[in-house]
Amino acid sequence: MGLGVKSTTEGNATFLAVAGGYVWDKSKDETHPQYNTQEYKKIDDSVGVRAGARYDNLTGEIVGVRFNQHEKYGESVLVTVASGGEKFIISIGTNNRYSQDMLKALLKMNFSKPIFINPYDFTDKVKNKRVQGISFKQDGEKINLRNDDAPFKEASFWKEANKKQIKRFFEDLTEWFTTTVTEKVIDVYFADGDVEATEKVAPKVVAKVEEIADEMPEVSENDLDDQLGALLG
């Protein structure tokens, strides 16, 4: 693959981020064949640029899950994926849409089988809304991310609630998912850290060729208010 990067804290692993509908290895520079840049609009309407090796998706076996608390950046979920003899650590802040889909998937997937991880971020032309998240497949079938036990609000809540109430709901929802993933996934499968992959999978980190036509505002991974503002307009 040529994606491995030596980490002083995680051994031989590649740290990956999910942003703008892609998987990014931000440690790579212009010399890497998959190097690319992507502009995004910040919350203050200024334009930022993310850069690094850019990929469409990642296929592999989940061999580790843990939560990490950072003094500056807050809580994140770290998901270790084994693929073709290499390890990739996907790091996502727990208060963004990508992490919600990741946490939902962790409660539904089979950890003994490889999984296809495909982020997306585009504009629904009909509804004129941003559509953002991650889709997952196992055995060629899309994983249904619906978790019936998760906190739920009726349609009337979304019509009448103010931003503070919605913010509180998402905070409660995030807490439910992090607690449930800890109890049902980490404590059960990864209590002692990363495990060995049970199946060798040919690495599939695919570069997306086409550019995103519409650049959407970037959602801060560190501020739920930013997330809600982007979702609610």
Label the predicted regions.
Residues 1-15, 164-233:
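Acidic, gly/ser/pro-rich intrinsically disordered tails
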Residues 98:
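Short, glycine/acidic-rich beta->alpha junctions
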Residues 1-91, 101-107, 122-171, 175, ...:
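OB-fold ssDNA-binding interfaces and closely related basic DNA-contact patches used
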